[in-house]
Amino acid sequence: MMEKVAVVHYGEIGIKGKNREFFERKLIEAIKRATGMRVRRKYGRIEVEYREGLESRMAKIPGIRYFGVGFKTELNLESIKKAALSVLPESFKTFKVDTSRSNKNFPMNSVEVNRKVGAFIVEKTGKKVDLTNPDVTVWIEICEKEAYVYSKRYEGIGGLPVGVAGKVVALISGGIDSPVAAFMAMKRGCEVVAVHFFNQTMHSPKVREKIRMLAEKLAEYQGKIKLYMVPFKEVQFEIINRVPPKLRMVVYRRSMMRMANLIAEKEGCKAVVTGDSLSQVASQTLDNINVIYSASKLAVLPPLIGMDKEEIVAIAKRIETYEISILPYEDCCSFMVAQHPETRAKIEDVVKYEGFEELERKAVEESEILEVGS
């Protein structure tokens, strides 16, 4: 008897030793949450009950290296042949069979299975074998109690399941970089709490909607995301009144770090994630980054630090945040950008203008907190 399933393969999880079961369990939870389907843990793979549309959801789950959609069948050659014939597309000219065998007690090795199943397909269809550049590949996995046969294979996004590395606060500005940084943190096993600082004097409804759209897109990779909308107006005005123009951006970002730390403490987060890319803008020089990050008690993780803009844009397009990020809006940084900003800030020149922790605490307390995604 054949059952249509998806068979999931992972990469790094397989080398996690004693923690492997924990990582697998987290991935299974993510698959169940994303698909709503029955999931079974098999050694070295995960089996998912199939339903229409499963592929698009599975492709966005961190921790999956690739998955095949086909049939689970009984562990004998005749059943495998029948399944192989069933997974072939209607139109093709050439094919090959690719067998892997984790069950060494199966009476044939991988080469023999390839040869026998291939000969059966030739006999039944009249198609030709092409081992170099086939139109169709039939993958066969010989396991302990069953075999999996499929010709549709989909690449996942790799990485680790969300949550295995703990929780982080990710600063979301509304630009191209910060959503990509949040995604990269998710891909390394972090559960993201998103934080956006907004200025209520601007086009708040449009800004709010754009940030919500970005969070919803990111939620496709994580599941539900908690989004903090932090009112920044009072802190911003204090910085404008107190700080020389060339230092405002550095002071402003240090203030964001302190507020992010307050939220992290509340949410049980262990680090702050930023969209910084080294030397991309004035605030992202090594000197300025050192001064800005020193305001955080927690580790600050910049996943994009070594990427150029083209690399970041390519990921943004792949995860479908790019078109949202380029929607026009005024962000609260615009007030802070000086004509000649400081690129080599010194901590002693910055801290003497600070001292608005009460306003920062008040802003965090007055944050709007949204639950985004499903």
Curated annotation (Swiss-Prot):
Q: Which Pfam families match?
A: ThiI, ThiI_fer, THUMP
Keyword Nucleotide-binding (UniProt): yes
The record's SUPFAM superfamilies line, in alphabetical order, gives:
Adenine nucleotide alpha hydrolases-like (SSF52402), THUMP domain-like (SSF143437)
Q: Which domain of life is it from?
A: Archaea
- The EC designation for this entry is 2.8.1.4
State where the protein is found.
Answer: Cytoplasm
- Protein name according to UniProt: Probable tRNA sulfurtransferase
Gene name linked to the record: thiI
